Amino acid sequence: MKISNVVNIDDMAVAARRYLPRIAFDYIDGGVDGEAALARNRQAFDRYKLLPRYLVDIEKRSQATRLFGHDYAAPFGICPMGIAGFFRPGADLMLARAAARFGVPYVMSSASCDSIDAAMEQAPQTTWFQIYGTRDTNITMDLIRRAKALDVRVLMLTIDTPVMAKRERNMRNGFRRPMKMTPSVILQGLSRPAWTLRYLAKGGIPMMENWRPYAGEGATANDVADLFGTETPAPAQTWDVLKLVRKAWPGPLVVKGVLHPDDALKCLEMGADGLVVSNHGGRQLDSAPAPMDMLPVIADAVGGRMELLIDSGFRRGSDIAKALCLGAKAALFGRPAMFGVAAGGEAGACKVLDIFRQEFSLVMGQMGWTEVGQAGPDCLLDLANPLAPARHDDPVS
């Protein structure tokens, strides 16, 4: 499928499936265990219906959003995704440039295949940086030092990966470290020659550039990947890691992977500026609730004292609108962006962002919104707890 023929995110997934070998596509598309959480993330949006308001002048509509003291063009962005360069060489920087073009945040993963230095050189106003707690805290501290030196605006600490996840599609397809060229993997590569030629032209397994300095001089891509696999997950880490990061990082700090309201309050108490309500895209705990189910609970708990973002399952502009109504300041998405950059490079990433922008603009028009701050719980019908469409104090009933 040509990128020019893509009209929605599902189309872009089809385009990515046709370009990538199964081992690569399933790494992006798959979840943990039986993928119940993956399905639940999408189903959670169906609980809520948007209540449109008409006969409102919506000719001029602004998606402008302010996050952590900075202005962005829309209430969405690209969440951190590791090893994007495996799916298309240079993908991390393509995503960074696409986000900059659209004026929305791009959160570079510390497990990216391009460096945070390169991303900040090309997209300094919109690039954030994500880190994990590591067994050797010196690595975490040095990543923070580098981010500070580059004037990264926002640091994101991911906390929802205390152990490895059982991702069954990867197990079946042979996606493992170190990558072994089994007959099955070779056949998958032969079935997608365009991807395979690009992969081989760049020397095979891409380097995790942010981690290269910690693996020693002359380290190979597999050496660096092995180090990353040794240092993360860090199952012994506690709330002390947040205390350590907060002390070291002077700017806005966002904690990613929060689903429990008590954890949200603990993050607030320890000085976090924001949260990403997330179940890691259904990739860690198959019995975890959908973030959309927990967002209103967490929003109620923190009471506007920190900025809330959300990820996992976003495919439509209407999904973003529902999240804003429930208390999020912005929504992040990973798979759609990865599908786009895999299938069409930077143009594919831009296409994904444009789809979300256009769909959200249309939803704003239907809702009678001229700015994103007009989204609120009164704009939703909760099918699990139906309420009257109009409030009692509304002049039109």
Per-range role (PLM):
Residues 60-69, 94, 107-119:
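Short, charged beta->alpha transition segments
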Residues 49, 64-66, 75-79, 105-107, ...:
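Short, conserved beta-strand segments within well-ordered enzyme catalytic domains
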Residues 73-111:
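Glycine-rich active-site/cofactor-binding loop and its immediate structural neighborhood
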Residues 1-46, 293-310, 315-397:
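Alpha/beta catalytic cores of nucleotide-metabolism and tRNA/nucleoside-modifying enzymes
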Residues 83, 97, 122, 138-310, ...:
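Alpha/beta enzyme core
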Residues 1-70, 178-237, 373-375, 381-397:
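An N-cap/entry alpha-helix motif that binds or orients negatively charged groups
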Residues 32-33, 110-114, 135, 259, ...:
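Short beta->alpha linker loops
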Residues 100-122, 126-140:
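A gly/proline- and charged-residue-enriched helix-loop-helix capping module
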